[in-house]
Amino acid sequence: MAPVCLFAPLLLLLLGGFPVAPGESIRETEVIDPQDLLEGRYFSGALPDDEDAGGLEQDSDFELSGSGDLDDTEEPRTFPEVISPLVPLDNHIPENAQPGIRVPSEPKELEENEVIPKRVPSDVGDDDVSNKVSMSSTSQGSNIFERTEVLAALIVGGVVGILFAVFLILLLVYRMKKKDEGSYDLGKKPIYKKAPTNEFYA
């Protein structure tokens, strides 16, 4: 209990008494105007500091005394209201939006614009057989059992299935014979012996 009482005021003093970071040390992100960089005001990395930022163009807000009283010497500015015509905001696309692009409708124009791929003569491709890939389903007969791979797989699968069935039947017969012989002894003696619980009185 004593260590907790000692650490509680110290913890409160550390967390509550001291601010984590003083306000003066926190800097805001500076915004650099790219136009100033293009005009050549800053050379070889001499970018403005926090104090220099805004020194070129002072707003009228900086000219006040700070007492809270505003100078009423400026005339209020009034802007004429411009009424824009109402434009409907829909997604309708007019038919003649792009007059340069049109679909040809005459058969002559269609024939002129048609692209016909070049055909390779059939006698050129007969000599080079290395590019042709034989499809396994079309290269041989349509009957699946005529293929040697399928027949070999069926024979091996059948043999494995028959062997599995024979071993399963043999296991069942063996268990049934073992049960009939009475090899299962229901009156087994326990492996451990319980210690006597005799009480001795002194």
UniProtKB/Swiss-Prot annotation:
UniProt GO cellular component terms: cell surface; costamere; extracellular region; focal adhesion; plasma membrane
Glycan-modified residues: S44, S65, S67
Keywords: Glycoprotein, Heparan sulfate, Membrane, Proteoglycan, Secreted, Signal, Transmembrane, Transmembrane helix
One MF annotation (Gene Ontology) recorded for this entry: protein kinase C binding
A GO biological process held by the record: regulation of fibroblast migration
Main location: membrane
Modification(s) after translation: Shedding is enhanced by a number of factors such as heparanase, thrombin or EGF. Also by stress and wound healing. PMA-mediated shedding is inhibited by TIMP3.
Disordered: annotated segments: 42-76, 89-138
Endpoints of the signal sequence: 1-23
Cytoplasmic side: 175-202
Membrane-topology descriptor: Single-pass type I membrane protein
Paired cysteines (S-S): none
Localisation: Membrane; Secreted
Biased composition (Basic and acidic residues): 105-121
Record topological domains on the Extracellular side: 24-149
Oligomer and partners: Homodimer. Interacts with CDCP1 and SDCBP. Interacts (via its cytoplasmic domain) with GIPC (via its PDZ domain). Interacts (via its cytoplasmic domain) with NUDT16L1. Interacts with DNM2; this interaction is markedly enhanced at focal ahesion site upon induction of focal adhesions and stress-fiber formation.
Similarity annotation: Belongs to the syndecan proteoglycan family.
Role summary: Cell surface proteoglycan which regulates exosome biogenesis in concert with SDCBP and PDCD6IP.
Name of the featured protein: Syndecan-4
Taxonomic source organism: Rattus norvegicus (Rat)
Protein encoded by which gene: Sdc4
